[in-house]
UniProtKB/Swiss-Prot annotation:
EC number(s) given by UniProt: 2.4.99.17
Role noted for this protein: Transfers and isomerizes the ribose moiety from AdoMet to the 7-aminomethyl group of 7-deazaguanine (preQ1-tRNA) to give epoxyqueuosine (oQ-tRNA).
Catalytic activity: 7-aminomethyl-7-carbaguanosine(34) in tRNA + S-adenosyl-L-methionine = epoxyqueuosine(34) in tRNA + adenine + L-methionine + 2 H(+)
Keyword Transcription regulation tagged: no
UniProt lineage: Bacteria, Bacillati, Bacillota, Clostridia, Moorellales
Record protein name field: S-adenosylmethionine:tRNA ribosyltransferase-isomerase
Top-tier EC class: transferase
A Gene Ontology cellular-component term: cytoplasm
Keyword presence, Heme: no
Length: 342
């Protein structure tokens, strides 16, 4: 398939710059795959589409203040560093700008010198492997003080509350970007779903370069995903498998959940607990094993995320739904509105 098959026109004014308040007041475009018809709702209407016994699977990853501003020792050149994946100890895979100023062996200084880094290598994707050093920890406290929340470049203004770029159920630190489908949930809505008999299972996928790396090839099958860390507990696997065995639906909250479950599922849809790294790339033609419904935001043109939802619902149905969403004034991308694909 060609990359241009996943293009669409979006007026810049429909790229959401701030989240709505409350979270579940965002709009919800419901796409019924069977029949292809659409409904216009709000996210707080979600309970009417779920049934007792269904299991909602969420990603409990937490975004870290992964953007650091520093300078190169010796030259004073200003350098931007985005932490992607922790490898071992204080060694991280990172993206740097401008890359030409950061060769192997370069030393970087952050803050007033309380955090330093040495470039140990270059990744195939053009990133840098950096080993950080500091005299006074802990690391998390240093990041909180020196780092910034790594908002996507299309968001031009910081949210008044940085916590709005976290889900209310975020637990495990490690992501360079939020699993945005989950941003619409409130504690009240989760409570309502539980009281309705909806099971909620938590998995983990730390969002890194694999989720938002642009596709630079014409033939999408040639694109190579960057690996991201995932974990599925025995309890989560048991909850999901029990729901499916009883004939209930597995509803994935976001593409990160889809990629995790499809990674650990057998051919007949049984979920196995475990952890590791996944570089699964889902595009039209893929046969889903693990999920029945999907909650997701509106994604960028030509992105792997748009390809994934097109694989699930059909490319034409998705692009038709996007055209309707544009016409009806829906808000797009990370702080935008949501879709429920049934």
């Amino acid at each position: 398939m060609r990359i241009e098959e996943f293009d669409y026109e979006l007026p810049p004014g429909q790229i959401a710059q701030q989240p709505v308040e409350p979270r579940d007041a965002s709009r919800l475009l419901v796409l019924h795959r069977e029949g292809g018809f659409l409904e216009h709702r709000h996210f707080y209407d979600l309970p009417r589409y779920l049934h007792p016994g269904d299991v909602l699977v969420v990603n409990e990853t937490k975004v870290i203040p992964a953007r650091l501003w520093g300078y190169r020792a010796g030259t004073g050149a200003k350098i931007e560093v985005l932490l992607l994946t922790r490898q071992e100890g204080d060694t991280w895979e990172t993206l740097v700008r401008p890359g030409r100023r950061v060769p192997v062996g370069a030393e970087l200084i952050f803050g007033r010198g309380e955090l330093q880094a040495r470039v140990k290598g270059v990744t195939p994707a053009g990133g840098r492997i950096m080993e950080f050093s500091y005299q006074e920890g802990p690391w998390e406290a240093l990041l909180e003080r020196l780092g910034e929340m790594p908002l996507p470049p299309y968001i031009k203004e910081k949210p008044a509350d940085p916590g709005r770029y976290q889900t209310v159920y975020a637990r495990e630190e490690g992501s360079a970007a939020a699993p945005t489908a989950g941003l619409h949930f409130t504690p009240r809505l989760l409570k309502e779903l539980r009281e309705q008999g909806i099971e909620i299972a938590s998995i983990l996928l730390h969002v890194g370069l694999g989720t938002f790396r642009p596709v630079k090839v014409e033939n999408i099958q040639e694109h190579v995903m960057h690996a991201e860390y995932y974990a599925v507990t025995p309890a989560a696997a048991a909850t999901i498998n029990a729901a499916r065995a009883r004939g209930h639906r597995v509803v994935a909250v976001g593409t990160t959940v889809v990629r995790t479950l499809e990674t650990v599922a057998t051919a007949d849809g049984v979920i196995h607990a475990g952890s590791g790294w996944t570089d699964i790339f889902i595009y039209p033609g893929y046969r889903f094993k693990a999920i029945d419904s999907l909650i997701t935001n509106f994604h960028l043109p030509r992105s792997t995320l748009l390809m994934l939802v097109s694989a699930f619902a059909g490319r034409e149905k998705i692009l038709d739904a996007y055209r309707v969403a544009v016409r009806e004034g829906y808000r797009f991308y990370s702080f935008g509105d949501a879709m429920l694909i049934l």
